[in-house]
Amino acid sequence: LSSLSNLVNNSGVVAADVTGVGTARDFLAAASYGLDKAIFGYGGSYSSLTNLVNNSGVVAADVTGVGTARRGPAAASYGTDKAIFGYGRTGSTLSMTNLVSSSGVVATDVTGVGTARAYLGAAGYGGDKAIFGYGETTLSMTNLVSNSGVVASDVTGVGTGRGYSAASGYGGDKALFGYGYTGSAISVTNLVSNSGVVAT
């Protein structure tokens, strides 16, 4: 396991390894918050630790975890300056979420909405909302998140069900899910409109 980080400049160029800070772990999630900062959280052997990242890309030491320790969650920004972690697994799959304030403080568990799952993707869309989607091993449903951090019930999945996908915003108000694993690695992508509709 590693705790290295790699900075990416505004041209998309990835820099060399930066010596790790905090607990080395895998299967964690990360999102931006506070307009210009980021947070890593959860992962490893069922951890709830977080690590804040300042607006220079410097990763801070571990912050004692809040909420259910788990691995395989997803995270996204919402509401322009906040973030949300959601889903994951311990011995079984989970559906709770944890909101992150504009100052990087993680709140306690919020009762889960939608299908419990892990190893899914999440991204911001629409300027101030978020979407969770897909999940281990062949799930394809999505859950929209309002600009106040409320997660909606399952939306019937579109596209290939898969786990271990990634997601990101693009174009200022849209999102994209890509890649994943169904039993073998796949390279499909699914675009998300600025109203949260997932395309085939």
Spans of model-derived segments:
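Polar, enzyme-active/binding microenvironments
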Residues: 1-200
